[in-house]
Amino acid sequence: MPGRTPTYKLPPLPRLKVKKPVIKQEANRCLVLMSNLLQCWSSNGHMNPVCEKLATDLKACTSQNVMGSNQKPRKSTINYHAARLYDRISGKPHD
């Protein structure tokens, strides 16, 4: 069949691996509260009673996280799932 273009296959990979997986980190709650408090103060004036709830929330948040969180940073699971599902996505022929 001279009219068909040849199809090229990629060489098989020993494993599928992402070198630097990016984990979406959630925003620090205390930083969000502090930003809201500063914005409230700039709009309403320093120590305005309108901003009192934000100030107490920020104090509570910072007292809970005095020494930082003891949680380890989460590892990405992309490489685990890529290895687990490699047979399905590598294009191997079916039974």
From Swiss-Prot:
GO terms for cellular component: mitochondrial small ribosomal subunit. Keywords: Disulfide bond, Mitochondrion, Ribonucleoprotein, Ribosomal protein. It comes from the Eukaryota. Disulfide bonds join 30-61, 40-51. A motif (Cx9C motif 2) lies at residues 51-61. A motif (Cx9C motif 1) lies at residues 30-40. Pfam families: CHCH (PF06747). Residues 27-69 form the CHCH domain. It is found in: Mitochondrion. Its main location: mitochondrion. The keyword Ribonucleoprotein applies. GO terms for molecular function: structural constituent of ribosome. GO terms for biological process: mitochondrial translation. Signal peptide: none annotated. Involved in mitochondrial genome encoded proteins translation. Component of the mitochondrial small ribosomal subunit. PANTHER family: 37S RIBOSOMAL PROTEIN MRP10, MITOCHONDRIAL (PTHR28066), SMALL RIBOSOMAL SUBUNIT PROTEIN MS37 (PTHR28066:SF1). Belongs to the mitochondrion-specific ribosomal protein mS37 family. This is Small ribosomal subunit protein mS37. It comes from Eremothecium gossypii (strain ATCC 10895 / CBS 109.51 / FGSC 9923 / NRRL Y-1056) (Yeast). The lineage of its organism: Eukaryota, Fungi, Dikarya, Ascomycota, Saccharomycotina. The gene is MRP10.
